[in-house]
Amino acid sequence: MVKLTSIAAGVAAIAATASATTTLAQSDERVNLVELGVYVSDIRAHLAQYYSFQAAHPTETYPVEIAEAVFNYGDFTTMLTGIAPDQVTRMITGVPWYSSRLKPAISSALSKDGIYTIAN
């Protein structure tokens, strides 16, 4: 017969190894900061592509905080707080490589941080 303490110890071990998860609205600032972090990293990695896109779409504007974050290689997350969720969505989904590059990277980053999103 299995002792209750053995079962409790097993459950505790499983619980200790499981990642904590949080479910947040897509417009939550924590979600936005993860999205913007991926976005800034992608701009840094593909700067010429973003310059070409902006030249072809001059009416697409970006908050000054994005440019500051791209060229400031320190901790930039505090710079990005306060950008409206609808503006975050517009910037990120407005580039042609959103589905192929940004969306998978954002999903991966959110999952890594234990964040799952729900529609607003």
Curated annotation (Swiss-Prot):
It is found in: Membrane. Pfam families: SRP1_TIP1. One of its GO terms (molecular function) is structural constituent of cell wall. It comes from the Eukaryota. The chain crosses the membrane at residues 7-24. InterPro entries: SRP1_TIP1, Yeast_SRP1/TIP1_CWP. One of its GO terms (cellular component) is fungal-type cell wall. It is a single-pass membrane protein. Its main location: membrane. One of its GO terms (biological process) is fungal-type cell wall organization. The keyword Iron does not apply. Keywords: Membrane, Transmembrane, Transmembrane helix. Belongs to the SRP1/TIP1 family. Seripauperin subfamily. This is Seripauperin-12. It comes from Saccharomyces cerevisiae (strain ATCC 204508 / S288c).
